[in-house]
Regions:
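Positively charged, amphipathic and often flexible ligand-engagement surfaces
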Residues: 1-314, 320
């Protein structure tokens, strides 16, 4: 059994000052009132043009972000590499909905791939479909509603952006993981990712979908996706996570009067997560996975499953704290 309790290994890339800083930051964030008010105060201060950006950048931003640009991230990437920790560049911009913003996100993702192609310490790229396509448009596609002529053109432009990213990832042979999002746009995202897999995963898994296993239907979807890949002759890549939108999903389901897509309890999420790991290992010659989990039991279970199979087909999380 692998031990995850050695904090000297887990935090070897951190200085004592950084650890103390992180400790007090998380302590403050552990207070719901302070967390809630902190965000509002910070937003107000920014709107009033008060000198708060430096404080944010040296506290919360520094803890969770590598930098504001690829160049700014470079130093941190090199530092982490000294401790055998690899990096994934994620251009995280949400709430933007103009064509200009979508094109900017596409260009940043393409630039990340260009940078990764020259840097072996960046094994993956990642993006969210809502970073390059309008949420409401995806929702309409998700439920099979007819698009207007203008909407169809808009959707075609979004598909062009996605294809451009996936094509470059394929040319560089750098896997790209496409994030999962809310259930009411996920079918649309799944359809797009499946098309990209059929096009670019003919030799190996380059395009990865993301499965949120806190949804009760994702294990079945995983098996259906694998069946399609075998039938159509391509590999599938899956990043397995538990999920990030539980409160939002339950609230919408209750408000709109439909059964929640969320599992009945955490135990069910854990069960399906581990069953997905099991299924991937049983079908390792056609499936590549990234186990995106901070759950120690699931990590130990995957290590146990890996013993009789080839390690080269499995991608474990690179975060040493997992």
């Amino acid at each position: 059994m692998v031990s995850f309790n050695n904090t000297e290994i887990a935090f070897s890339s951190k200085s004592k000052l950084q650890l103390h800083k992180a400790y007090y930051l998380f302590k403050l964030m552990g207070h719901p009132f302070l967390s809630k008010m902190g965000g509002k105060v910070a937003e107000l201060a920014i709107n009033l043009h008060l000198p708060i950006k430096g404080i944010i950048k040296n506290t919360v931003f520094q803890q969770f972000c590598g930098g504001e640009s690829i160049e700014e991230c470079s130093l941190r990437i090199d530092e982490l590499a000294q401790y055998q920790i690899k990096t994934i560049l994620d251009y995280s911009v949400e709430g933007k909905a103009s064509e200009k913003d979508f094109n900017r996100t596409m260009k940043q993702t393409l630039a990340s791939l260009d940078f990764a192609n020259k840097n072996s310490n960046i094994p993956f790229a990642v993006f969210k479909v809502t970073g390059i396509a309008r949420f409401e448009l995806l929702e309409k596609v998700n439920f099979g509603k007819e698009l207007t002529e203008q909407e169809q053109k808009e959707y075609d432009r979004a598909l062009h952006r996605i294809n451009k990213i996936c094509k470059k990832a394929s040319q560089y042979k750098i896997p790209v993981m496409i994030d999962a999002e809310e259930s009411w746009i996920q079918d649309a995202i799944d359809g797009i990712v499946e098309d990209m897999m059929r096009e670019y995963n003919k030799e190996t898994a380059i395009i990865y979908n993301t499965l949120q296993m806190y949804r009760h239907d994702r294990l079945d979807y995983f098996k259906k996706a694998h069946k399609d890949s075998k039938h159509n002759g391509y590999f599938i890549g899956m990043k397995l996570v538990r999920g990030a939108y539980m409160e939002k999903e339950n609230a919408r389901a209750q408000k709109m009067g439909y059964p929640t897509p969320i599992q009945a309890n955490k135990e069910a999420s854990d069960r399906d997560y581990d069953l997905a790991l099991e299924y991937a290992c049983e079908n390792i010659h056609g499936i590549s996975i990234c186990a995106g989990t901070h759950n120690e039991e699931s990590s130990q279970y995957l290590i146990k499953l890996m013993n009789p199979v080839s390690y080269t087909h499995l991608t474990l999380p690179t975060n040493r704290e997992v």
